[in-house]
């Protein structure tokens, strides 16, 4: 599946989730005012989600280019790399104002696209993310991803995605 197709699927899912959220949410204001003007809100949310998905996918592809794939066969380095990517997605989601549902969908798609997890593994992994403390070892790995994507997008370090290759080697030899 190409990156473009993945992005279309993510945007479609986001639009449907947001549509259902608006359609099935009881609201006294909506019943008094008649139909709500949810169209622009859905369109805006879908655009933000598409933007995050595109940036996250590009970052994941750039990060995975130099990674030793053999090192990712061990669960430790693979899970650590997934935590790193989760941090990057989290940073992008926060920066663009995505909600939890959209963040979850993008994270699952990016982890699967990067080859770090299967669809089922990515779903379980992303479901566990809210329970991880920022001060835990896992939280620190997520912070590395957040810091790296920030450095990349701010122009501080154009080679920032290559840091993942170095980290994977460190994790594989630890």
Q: How would you describe each model-predicted region?
A:
Residues 39, 43-46, 50, 108, ...:
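Residue-level detector of alpha-helical secondary structure
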Residues 121-174:
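Low-complexity intrinsically disordered segments
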Residues 1-38:
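N-terminal signal-anchor transmembrane alpha helix of single-pass membrane proteins
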Residues 2, 8, 99-103, 171-173:
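Basic/polar, acidic-poor N-terminal "presequence/leader" segments
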Residues 26-74:
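N-terminal topogenic membrane-targeting module
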Residues 40, 47-54, 75-83, 98-101, ...:
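Alpha-helix boundary/N-cap detector
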Residues 61-95:
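N-terminal interaction modules that seed assembly of large macromolecular complexes
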Residues 103-120:
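Short, mixed-charge aromatic SLiMs
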């Amino acid at each position: 599946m190409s990156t473009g197709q993945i992005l279309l699927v993510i945007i479609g899912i986001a639009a449907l989730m947001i549509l259902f959220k608006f359609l099935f949410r009881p609201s006294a204001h909506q019943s008094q005012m008649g139909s709500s003007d949810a169209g622009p809100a859905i369109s805006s949310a879908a655009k933000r989600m598409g933007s995050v998905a595109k940036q996250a996918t590009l970052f994941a592809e750039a990060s995975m280019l130099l990674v030793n794939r053999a090192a990712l066969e061990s669960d430790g380095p693979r899970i650590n790399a997934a935590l790193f990517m989760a941090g990057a997605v989290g940073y992008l989601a926060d920066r663009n104002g995505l909600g939890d549902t959209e963040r979850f969908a993008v994270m699952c798609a990016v982890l699967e696209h990067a080859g770090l997890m299967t669809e089922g593994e990515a779903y379980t992994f992303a479901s566990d993310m809210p329970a991880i403390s920022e001060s835990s070892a896992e939280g620190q790995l997520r912070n590395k991803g957040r810091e790296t994507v920030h450095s990349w997008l701010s122009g501080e370090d154009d080679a920032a995605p290559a840091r993942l290759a170095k980290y994977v080697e460190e994790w594989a030899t630890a």
